[in-house]
Amino acid sequence: MRKLPAIKPRQIIRFLEQHDFILDHTTGSHYVYYHPTSRRRAVVPQHNRDLPKGTLMSLLREAGFTRNELIDFLSGS
């Protein structure tokens, strides 16, 4: 299992948008994205710090992705 890198919220937003997630609304400092066909939601905090690993894994789980899918996206594969 490959190690999950530290990433910023902007990178996870780009990953979600690449996979057809659409910005639904913002609540405070969080962006709420949804997928039109799977109806899955992902809540992304908006700040300029790296996302904690637990938050990142929770976000991937609620959006229906695996750690390896994100790592492949970040490495450009």
For every predicted segment, state its role.
Residues 49-77:
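C-terminal structural segments of small proteins and small subunits
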Residues 2-5, 42, 49, 58:
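Flexible, active-site-adjacent loop/turn segments at secondary-structure boundaries
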Residues 11, 36-40, 57, 68-71:
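Short amphipathic alpha-helical patches
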Residues 15, 21, 33-34, 65, ...:
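Aromatic side chains
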Residues 1-27:
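N-terminal first-folded block
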Residues 22-54:
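A short, structured beta-strand/loop element
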